[in-house]
């Protein structure tokens, strides 16, 4: 079995992310650091990531976490900022986030040890819907709503059509519900910036079939069986 596939089956990361980890020199097989793709893993081999032995997980676990602003979704942070995974050090299995929420954003984050599901959900072909509640500076006009819906030019590439609905007009801000299926870096923030509106607060309220609901900020819960079925059936 290829090393990156083995890592995915251990729940470490998607194959694509596993390849990045290998290239960064974070993976060893039987004590030998691996940096090239194509390495085969045989039964009895000891694979370590960041010095920690990994093994395929037999029981898949799925957790919804309401990430607050001010936490990073990486496994560790060189700047010493608080990491999402700090909350799960004592969890029975090692969890990994499915995708990311940027440092200043909050909301629904899925964590799991199911590497195969992670890979499927993050693959561009599945176009997983991600819905955000954005509070932005100023008054968003209908012309700007139409621009956001049709696509905004970012890095010389137009964003895919988005679902956009104004929820509330405040004295100096607008609350907007936005659904996208792409995963560009800080995409929603940059889309609004291109229309002249700074994002004041951004919360992800839906991810695929999952709904954040009333889960308090900074709290987590395991998915219900119905929620797990909705994920595994579709993805």
Question: Which residues does each predicted region cover?
Answer:
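Basic, flexible Lys/Arg- and Gly-enriched helix-loop patches that mediate nucleic-acid binding at interfaces
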Residues: 1-235
